[in-house]
Design a protein with these regions (language model features):
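Structured catalytic/nucleic-acid-binding cores of DNA maintenance enzymes
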Residues: 1-214
């Protein structure tokens, strides 16, 4: 199961890859069909993490405040078996997968997306770019040549942007919330010291009060 620091980096990576774009959202598996239909065509307004929880806000316009009542939040917790897998054209630089071991979307091997090439993307697979990874990504398919592969396995959620696709499989949680619902989850989780608004002292005090080691 990815720990909180990985989810924070994943949140930043998804913001780099899809932030400000109107996304096509599907649920190939069908279990999240209603939620996907509500998000389809909306703009990803950013991405946040709190502990092991990922929060993605969607709205009808790119210039919206996250406090707007029309913003819908997608909450995802990978759990033990959840994973994101990625595929895209040469403009789309992302890791192969995050979470439980998975092959890349559709098992297509012609365009390696290892490690990532940006500040948030680098190291998502647990390390920096390997030799030749940048060259491999640079020689991936051109935007006009790339086509989204068929979903592989039980894909709960698919996000399709201008240059690439992200598939979510096997999450412990995948649900839509309003702002009050997000706030309720965050209160239950307690402080996250990795967040800019995280109360580090409160986190340390809570950690010291626990008998179970962290």
């Amino acid at each position: 199961m990815p720990e909180g620091h990985t989810i924070h980096r994943l949140a930043a990576a998804l913001d780099e890859l899809y932030g400000g774009q109107s996304l096509r959202v599907r649920s190939p598996q069908g279990r999240f069909a209603d939620g996907a239909s509500r998000l389809d065509g909306q703009v990803l307004l950013g991405s946040q993490a709190h502990g092991k929880h990922l929060f993605l806000p969607f709205g009808p316009r790119v210039d919206m405040s996250l406090d707007d009542a029309s913003v819908t939040w997608l909450r995802i917790h990978l759990g033990l078996y959840g994973a994101w897998t990625f595929d895209g054209d040469r403009e789309f630089t992302a890791p192969n997968a995050i979470g439980a071991p998975r092959r890349r979307v559709g098992e297509r091997g012609e365009h390696a997306l290892k490690g990532g090439g940006g500040s948030a993307l680098t190291g998502l697979n647990g390390g920096s770019l390997e030799p030749g990874d940048r060259d491999t990504a640079a020689h991936g398919p051109a935007p006009e040549e790339w086509e989204p592969p068929e979903p592989r396995g039980a894909v709960r959620l698919r996000l399709l942007g201008e240059h690439g696709v992200a598939d979510l499989t096997g999450p412990a949680a995948c649900e839509l919330l309003d702002a009050e619902g997000v706030a309720a989850v965050r209160r239950r989780l307690g402080p996250d010291p990795l967040r800019a608004d995280g109360d580090v002292e409160a986190f340390v005090a809570k950690a010291r009060s626990r008998r179970k080691s962290i």
